[in-house]
């Protein structure tokens, strides 16, 4: 099962003509199924392992989001990259876990499309990893090649676009984009390449990059879309999205958390409910012309059902 030019072209047309709705949080949804240590193959917390050990759990999460009415889901591959996988000593399984994650999402999307004929797409998630090349934690070429394996697996599994997400370091972001490009060249595939950055409550990326600098650095790489996800709720994203709307020459996306987490006796909770997220995204679409909307940490199928 591989990416097809027809599906990718349909996604491009949809992004150019209307607002496409993506899914919400993945990790918390997986944890709600209470996977065992055996499910994790003794790699507790490595959600990507579930793509091969418990594909039924991953498929059920995708099904819940498609059931809520979203147009596309992200693959369960946020940590299927060199640095994150190396933490579990499974860097050699990046391609395997990426392909499996994309295949599960693709099969679920096709199942729902088969029911009503409505197109549904798969966004291949390429997460930031756990090392910052700008600080010398890892060599640029190492993570670039790791991202190429990540992207090749996603394309082989049937992803319709590649989403470089939650980026915190511009050098890491560039490595992700170049790795994705090399994967497309190696496989003879062309799909939309989306980049979503994480900006802290301080107003900058983790390493201090401002929104203008990030746009200037990334837009010339030939990406198809740029935007924000994670780290904050929609309120804290407003000014950054305003800047992108004024200065970017490519379409925009927004996938905020359900507000800023609050500590309670039961642990962290996200305060923004479904209506709050929907209202914020509606405002962003109206004022900033977003093409792709969704949710990140703390968002659920109920949030997305209201957003749809």
Name every feature range the model reports, one short phrase each:
Residues 1-308:
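Domain-level signal for soluble alpha/beta catalytic cores
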């Amino acid at each position: 099962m591989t990416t097809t030019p027809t599906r990718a072209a349909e996604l491009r047309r949809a992004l150019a003509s209307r607002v496409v709705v993506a899914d919400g949080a993945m990790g918390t949804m997986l944890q709600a199924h209470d996977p065992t240590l055996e499910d994790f193959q003794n790699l507790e917390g490595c959600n990507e392992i579930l793509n091969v050990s418990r594909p039924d759990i991953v498929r059920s999460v995708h099904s819940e989001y498609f059931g809520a009415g979203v147009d596309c889901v992200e693959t369960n591959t946020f940590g299927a990259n060199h640095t994150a996988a190396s933490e579990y000593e499974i860097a050699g399984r990046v391609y395997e876990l990426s392909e499996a994650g994309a295949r599960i999402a693709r099969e679920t999307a096709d199942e729902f499309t088969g029911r009503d004929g409505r197109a549904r797409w798969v966004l291949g998630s390429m997460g930031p990893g756990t090392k910052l090349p700008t600080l010398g934690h890892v060599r640029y070429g190492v993570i670039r090649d790791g991202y190429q394996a990540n992207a090749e697996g996603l394309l082989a599994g049937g992803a319709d676009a590649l989403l470089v997400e939650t980026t915190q370091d511009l050098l890491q972001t560039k490595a992700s984009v170049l790795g994705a490009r090399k994967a497309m060249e190696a496989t003879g595939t062309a799909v939309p390449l989306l980049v979503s950055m994480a900006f802290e409550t301080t107003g900058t990326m983790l390493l201090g990059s401002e929104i203008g600098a990030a746009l200037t650095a990334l837009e010339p790489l030939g990406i198809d879309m740029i935007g924000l996800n994670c780290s904050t709720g929609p309120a804290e994203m407003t000014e950054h999205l305003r800047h992108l709307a004024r200065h970017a020459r490519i379409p925009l996306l927004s996938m905020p958390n359900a507000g800023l987490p609050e500590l309670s006796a039961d642990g962290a909770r996200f305060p923004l409910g479904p209506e709050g997220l929907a209202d914020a995204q509606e405002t962003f679409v109206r004022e900033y012309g977003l093409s792709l909307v969704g949710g990140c940490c703390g968002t659920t199928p109920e949030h997305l059902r209201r957003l749809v």
